[in-house]
Amino acid sequence: MWIRALLCIAMLAIAAGVALAARRDWTGSAACGTCHPQQLAAWQTTRHAMTRDRFPAKPEGRCLACHGTGEAPAGPAIAVEVGCEACHGAGAAYAEDDVMRNRPVARVLGLTDTSTPTARAAVCSQCHARQTRGTVFDSSAPVHPVKSVSR
């Protein structure tokens, strides 16, 4: 009974956008890449992966809210990069293979829904709410396009 109550509280907090992650809840992009190597390789070629190059020194917490992965500006950033978990949510709770394969459970445990263009736009618009450097943000463009391997 208490497990059901805990899951309900977690679902309500996630739906309300409340940050529940602690430093130990973040796995880092390299950990995600152990099961998703094509996505990791594709992401590594993007501006999201190269965020650190934009800052001459350690960025302020307010910058890391969009240019980092973690709890910034309210808490610590785990990386100066827009890593997997910056968009998909802190992964420690849902990273196990059997959990990741069960999407409803993974979502309850923190996996952010990015399965539709509307869901992706909602995630992306948290940082891409305005035009940057004269470039209009295209929410329909793939973030880390994976090229299919022809045989």
Task: Annotate the PLM regions.
Residues 3, 18-151:
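Short sequence/structural segments immediately N-terminal
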